[in-house]
Amino acid sequence: MGSGGVIHCRCAKCFCYPTKRRIKRRPRNLTILSLPEDVLFHILKWLSVGDILAVRAVHSHLKYLVDNHASVWASASFQELWPSPQNLKLFERAAEKGNFEAAVKLGIAYLYNEGLSVSDEACAEVNGLKASRFFSMAERLNTGSEPFIWLFIRPPWSVSGSCCKAVVHDSLRAECQLQRSHKASILHCLGRVLNLFEDEEKRKQARSLLEESSRQGCLISSYLLWESDRKVDMSDPGRCLHSFRKLRDYAAKGCWEAQLALAKACAGGSQLGLEGKACSESVCQLFQASQAVNKQQIFSVQKGLSDTMRYILIDWLVEVATMKDFTSLCLHLTVECVDRYLRRRLVPRYKLQLLGIACMVICTRFISKEILTIREAVWLTDNTYKYEDLVRVMGEIISALEGKIRIPTVVDYKEVLLTLVPVAPRTQHLCSFLCELTLLHTSLSIYAPARLASAALLLARLMHGQTQPWTTHLWDLTGFSYSDLVPCVLSLHKKCFHDDAPKDYRQVSLTAVKQRFEDKCYEEISREEVLSYADLCSTIGVKQESPEPPSFPSSGEIHTFLSSPSGRRSKRKRENSLQEDRGSFVTTPTAELSNQEETLLGSLLDWSLECCSGYEGDQESEGEKEGDVTAPSRLLDVTVVYLNPEEHCCQESSDEEAWPEDKIHPAPGTQAPPASAPRPLLCNRGDRAKDITTSGYSSVSSSSPISSLDGGMGGSPQSTSVLSVGSHSSTKPCHHQAKKSCLQCRPPNSPESGVHQQPVKRQNLSVHSDKDMHLAS
């Protein structure tokens, strides 16, 4: 009953239920923390260690994930970061959690005493034990490639005092005696090291180590034992057949060296009881498994790199390989390492030469008996870089390539073809010449290495007028028909012979490969007249297309960014030169001086090269780099702009240009070299700009570091680009019409002023030190 005695019913008209208030749900805020942990791990993986520490500080849950899951540290990136006292704990933690890059860099840092200075008197022993620990970790984590740590501790070892390499070797050997698992690769490395000694006792120990490694499943150790026994096994038919079966087993398991040896062994297939068809199928499988890797991807990663700049770098590496008499395989592996690194990591332009020479140091140690030492490599760059720069970039390279150095190359397939097919010596040299030229052009990388090698052999036989350049036997061996190879042959001819080679800023053509094959050991094959493109098309039976335009920019667009290898040596051919024969130019450090100067300089050069080349100079494990090179007084910006020589004060021009134009008179007591003689190839480091007409390259620094010897080093070498006799440290502006830009100008230090540049202890000027301190805080 309501008010006033009125009775209300509960119908919808008289009675209303209170309406329900609908509460709006707040939208759920989704953040990165809302993701499943598996997804978070994928996000955290491959971040740099600095980013991981920054993420760790954001939230307690992220902190928990970073601190309690090893996979985050195992995949953390330490790119461009080197071990130092400030970040040592981060490196050690990552290495213990399974980070390959951290383990490699720690091992190299302790071995070369770079970045982690030890003030203990027994520096070699302390560092050697620590390096051994992290090298062992790195080898244990290296599951996809051959054992590699032996290349860092291979001889020569120091004969005076303690040697860090020897300490690492002994420590690893002791570890193998105690540890029962994961030691096959370590045993292989120990065996490889001892096998390089001349001592017969050490070689016996090396064989026993390799046998133990083979029993524990190391495939490459098994192949090395097979190779050492091959000569003995081939003398007996029964043992020969058993040896061949073992080789076939190793090849089937994926050993690349065994696959190559098996393919070459098919040349004597009848002796092994194999039918011709079975041999052809075995070789064909090898060739058809070859895959192309498009090197044009380099330029999508390296935005500041051009094809011409890469051409200049590879040309310089060819010149170094020629000077040091390295094999074509070593050169090809070096270039492959450079290209693989460029596809994976950014490289500033001023570090290209450092990358190239570091790859050569690694490859020579991995496959050659004669090595390129770190000191000599620094010298070859005209001391543009320092000892520690090269040591650190070696760690970056091994980390980026994940320890995989040996990969299939064009040379491998070429050697197989030349073993299986009878080819005239000059045709073999021409085929090798063509294979070497393929290194210079990234556009040819669209073809697999096996196809390139086959096309090189076909083109060589065509150029030498073979009536049957590609037989059915070659078709069966490679799986490539004549028509399959025609496009590759045409591209090869265009790039190697039709397109002009790029020129440096001095209008000098970069032809190091051509000069390499002008040697008599190659029967001067590069001097041979080349079959024209029209005649080639006519011989092949295809319609001639308009040749592609040269892909290289004009000389005005080419900037210098490399230093001449050791030296200011040049066999380049200047197109506008009046000299028709420049073949007399040599690639070894020589100079056209007076008799007295030649005697003094020759003695100094002999001493320097004796100390710093080959095995005798690689005493890098004693901390000998300390005090080796002084820090440069200043650095030149690598962005080089071409300047009008009439408007800019440059230093003296090269001897080729200055003598005929300026009529420079020799200093009293010296003999002026004739105009047709090679220019001096050794000069004062402080006066390096006087010789900027090197073999197509110029140093990036305005003044080279001054070398000094550590007092306790004894016979450790100085850089061989030392003060030449009769040179003056003062420089004067040139007043002639120079044909090049002035890239290196430094204030004169007159000898009469009595002011001498004092060597200072090398300091670490790396840019990552601030970051290290930040990460450790």
From Swiss-Prot:
GO terms for cellular component: centriole; centrosome; nucleoplasm; nucleus; perinuclear region of cytoplasm; SCF ubiquitin ligase complex. A motif (Nuclear localization signal 1) lies at residues 20-28. Disruption phenotype: Death by 10.5 dpc, with many developmental anomalies due in part to failures in yolk sac and chorioallantoic placentation. Heterozygous mice are normal and fertile. Residues 768-777 have a biased composition (Basic and acidic residues). Residues 29-76 form the F-box domain. Residues 288-405 form the Cyclin N-terminal domain. The keyword Ubl conjugation applies. Residues 751-767 have a biased composition (Polar residues). A motif (D box 2) lies at residues 343-346. Disulfide bonds: none annotated. A motif (D box 3) lies at residues 349-352. A motif (Nuclear localization signal 2) lies at residues 568-574. A motif (D box 4) lies at residues 762-765. The nuclear localization signals mediate the localization to the nucleus and are required for CCNB1 localization to the nucleus. Substrate recognition component of a SCF (SKP1-CUL1-F-box protein) E3 ubiquitin-protein ligase complex which mediates the ubiquitination and subsequent proteasomal degradation of target proteins. The SCF(CCNF) E3 ubiquitin-protein ligase complex is an integral component of the ubiquitin proteasome system (UPS) and links proteasome degradation to the cell cycle. Mediates the substrate recognition and the proteasomal degradation of various target proteins involved in the regulation of cell cycle progression and in the maintenance of genome stability. This is Cyclin-F.
